[in-house]
Amino acid sequence: MPLKYSITISPRAIADLNIIHAHVSISSPQSATSLIQDLFRAIDRLNELPHPHAIQSGRRKPSQTVRRVPIHRFVIYFRIDEATQTVNVLTVRHGSRQRPRRF
């Protein structure tokens, strides 16, 4: 049985999810709720298999490596902390937005 990681969601990522929900709710409250549920399901799945996801470009120490997982038109950026067996969700952005330079 694979090791399960705990998940933490940064205040920035929570704010991102709230903004996404508010923006989509303007045109379709039902779609907004469904989208947020899908994003949270994708985040929850990171507890079992966080490593296969694409690595954000850039030279970083392994502990600073940022990975990304696309879901619908959005991208979830996260970091894996092997020492604490934790997946840290950093931010959630629309795929058309420029990738963050800093996390």
Predicted regions and their residues:
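Enriched for short, Lys/Arg-rich terminal
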Residues: 71-75, 79-103
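Basic, Lys/Arg-enriched alpha-helical interface segments
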Residues: 1-66, 100-102
